[in-house]
UniProtKB/Swiss-Prot annotation:
GO CC aspect terms: cytoplasm; nucleus
SMART domains the UniProt entry points to: PHD
Pfam families the UniProt entry points to: PHD_2
Region: Disordered, residue numbers: 50-80
Keywords: Autophagy, Cytoplasm, Metal-binding, Nucleus, Zinc, Zinc-finger
Domain remarks: The PHD-type zinc-finger domain is required for negative regulation of autophagy.
Organism of this sequence: Danio rerio (Zebrafish)
PROSITE patterns: ZF_PHD_1
GO terms (BP aspect): autophagy; negative regulation of autophagosome assembly; negative regulation of autophagosome maturation; positive regulation of protein ubiquitination
Role this protein plays: Acts as a negative regulator of autophagy.
The name this protein goes by in its record: PHD finger protein 23A
Keyword Cytoplasm: yes
Length: 296
């Protein structure tokens, strides 16, 4: 029994004599702050801090022992120190970000030469834009004037055609009138031929004026019956042969077979599409009807 006890005591002594493994120190807030500052300086957010002096109250082992042995007061002081360290870290990070942003802005700012180039480009662009605007305005004016001119040309062409048709019909009627009337065979033939020549020349003048001056076609070259009457100036336009008492005035007429009097188609109630070959005025019809009754 004594031998066993001695052996047990020897083992206990050996265990005590052997060096115990050192206990791992617990991490504190200061260690965390140091780690954060190291990471920030490594990333370039914070400028590298100067090496601290060899002795500092935070790095001395006495302070660690005192902090471990002290009570609540020391814990409160460490918390306040840690908060102040965190505030300092945040301030440093903010300053680093502002410095980096300002440096980027300054790096993006152009130099004096580039500013001169930019002003020259702006001025050239302004000049080009003005020239382009002028061109666009001219094109718009031309495009707006084009259809107007085409419309005016079409109107003038139609009006000239209508005037020529009226002139031709009047000339035909006058020729027919002069060939069939026995009273004015010599003198009126010359007048009517001169009138036809004048009317033809007037029509040609109208066409030439309408082709040369397209801008004033809508206002100056509107041809109507009254204009033709004024331009002609001959006595044949004022001849009154119809029973209505109105002059010839270039309107279509028809001749009676018996009395050779010219009557307007509108007064005789005859359409232009249904003109008869033989026509008797209402006076001749009445006289013929009375003679037929007398014979019976």
């Amino acid at each position: 029994m004594l031998g066993i006890m001695d052996h047990h005591q020897d083992t206990v002594r050996k265990c005590k004599s052997e060096a115990l493994p050192p206990e791992r120190r617990k991490r504190t807030v200061e260690d965390f702050n140091k780690f954060c500052s190291f990471v920030l300086t490594y990333a370039g957010y914070i400028p590298p801090q100067k090496e601290e002096s060899s002795w500092s109250p935070s790095s001395s082992p006495c302070t660690h022992d005192l902090s471990e042995l002290s009570g609540e007061g020391s814990v409160k002081d460490s918390w306040t120190d840690s908060h102040s360290d965190l505030n300092n870290i945040h301030n440093l990070v903010y300053k680093a970000e502002t410095d980096s942003s300002s440096s980027r802005e300054f790096s993006h700012l152009p130099s004096d030469n580039s500013l001169d180039k930019m002003t020259l480009k702006d001025s050239l662009n302004h000049v080009h834009s003005k020239a382009e605007r002028k061109k666009v305005k001219k094109l718009d004016r031309l495009s707006l004037g084009g259809p107007r001119k085409s419309i005016s040309e079409a109107r003038a062409h139609k009006q000239s055609k209508a005037a020529l048709k009226k002139i031709k019909t009047s000339i035909k009627a006058e020729r027919h009138f002069t060939s069939s009337s026995p009273l004015n065979e010599g003198f009126e033939k010359e007048e009517l031929t001169e009138q036809a020549i004048h009317m033809h020349e007037a029509g040609l003048k109208l066409e030439s004026n309408q082709e040369t001056d397209l801008s004033s076609c809508e206002t100056d070259t509107l041809v109507t019956d009254e204009d033709i009457m004024v331009e002609s100036g001959d006595d044949s336009w004022d001849l009154i042969t119809c029973y209505c008492g109105k002059p010839f005035a270039g309107r279509p007429m028809i001749e009676c077979e018996e009395c050779s009097i010219w009557v307007h188609l509108s007064c005789a109630k005859i359409k232009k599409s249904n003109v008869p070959d033989i026509f008797y005025c209402y006076r001749c019809l009445d006289s013929r009807g009375s003679t037929v009754k007398r014979d019976h």
